[in-house]
């Protein structure tokens, strides 16, 4: 976010790393702790590279400056920054609603990226909004407005994925299929 404020380009590699990180954490998508440690390590390495490119390092958040080199350091930090670290239940709920919206958006983006489609505005929004979920000066009203904006940009993400799918595979069309039975062995596909 700060790099963009300085007019510097954020690479597709950074955007895709963040998208994959978010996608990795969606519900029921990953149960392997080692993958999460690897993702955090890769992100911290990338963050160090990004910090080196910044001209103005003043007033960066603690999250922007934090680093770790061991699994134990990561585990020690987790309860201090996890969901329950936000005491106000209304603020916590709104932040999580926004984060889940961004995770959903990351799923659209990941699948669109796999087909060669991307959108810098959506990437920038996701990253700036993640940073805003750490901003303790935002009120519940501010977070409600951000939730609504997240929904709007989520629709943009769906549109990008639709363009990626139809641009790659064509538009769905009604197709007649034989639903009869034959004497040959076969595989039943349903769903």
Language-model features: locations:
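Metallocofactor- and cofactor-centric catalytic cores in central/energy metabolism, strongly enriched
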Residues: 1-191
């Amino acid at each position: 976010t700060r790099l963009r404020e300085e007019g510097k380009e954020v690479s597709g590699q950074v955007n895709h790393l963040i998208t994959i990180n978010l996608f990795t954490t969606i519900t029921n998508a990953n149960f392997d702790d080692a993958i999460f440690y690897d993702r955090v390590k890769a992100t911290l390495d990338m963050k160090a590279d990004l910090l080196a490119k910044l001209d103005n390092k003043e007033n960066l958040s603690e999250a922007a400056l934090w680093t770790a080199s061991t699994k134990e350091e990561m585990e020690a930090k987790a309860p201090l920054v996890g969901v329950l670290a936000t005491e106000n239940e209304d603020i916590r709920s709104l932040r999580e609603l926004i984060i889940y919206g961004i995770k959903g958006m990351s799923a659209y983006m990941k699948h669109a990226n796999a087909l060669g489609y991307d959108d810098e505005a959506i990437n920038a929004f996701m990253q700036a909004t993640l940073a805003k979920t750490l901003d303790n000066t935002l009120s519940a009203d501010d977070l409600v407005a951000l939730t609504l904006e997240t929904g709007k940009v989520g629709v943009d993400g769906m549109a990008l994925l639709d363009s990626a799918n139809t641009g790659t595979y064509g538009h769905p069309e009604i197709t007649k299929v034989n639903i009869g039975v034959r004497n040959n062995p076969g595989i039943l596909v349903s769903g």
